[in-house]
C-alpha cells in the first residue's frame, strides 16, 4: 500500500471483525471524492486477490460498501469491471483472475453490475486467451452455483439480451456457457462416481467383517 489513503483503507478492512464492521470502518474515513471511492474498490480487489484461497468476506464487503455509497460506488465498480474484462487480465496470475472473477460474479448476482460490462471483452479474445476463458468460466460457474433459481433465470436472460446475435462476443458467450455446463456435468459425474465407490467400499468392508465374525449364535435359535 503505497499511499496514506491506501494504507488507511487497508487498515480499516484488516481490523474489521466482519464485513459489516469493515464497511463501517471505511465509512468512518469519510472519503468523499470519486477517486477515493475508486481507491476503496481497488484495495478491496487487491486484498481479495492476495488471499491464498478465495475469501467470501471480500465479496460481502464489496456489496456492503456499494450499498452504503450508492451510485458513486456502482459507477466506479463498473469502470473497474470494464478494465478487468477489457485488457488487464493478461498481467494477472491465475489466482488473481479467479479471485477477482468471484467478486465480479457476486456483483452480478446482487445487481451491482449489469451484464453489459461483458461487452468490453476484446472480440475473439475468449477463444484465444486461457486467462480470459478462466475469468468468464469462473464468473458463470459462480453464478450457476450461488444464484437462486429465479435470479439465475433473470441473469441468463440478461446475459444474452446484452448482446446482438450477430456480435462475435455473443458466440464467445455461448461457448463460455457451454464450457461451464460441461465442467459442471463432469463435476457431477465425478461426485456420483465417488459416492458409488464409497458405497462399494463400505459394503465390501461390512461383508468382510461379517465373514470374520461368522454366523450369529442367535441364528441357531431361530
Model regions and ranges:
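Long, low-complexity, highly charged intrinsically disordered regions
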Residues: 1-56, 71, 75, 193-194, ...
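Short sequence/structural elements of tandem HEAT/ARM alpha-solenoid repeats
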Residues: 21-26, 35-43, 56-61, 72-80, ...
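Flexible helix-coil junctions and inter-repeat linker/turn elements that act as hinges
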Residues: 32, 50-54, 66-72, 90, ...
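Hydrophobic alpha-helical bundle architecture
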Residues: 83-124
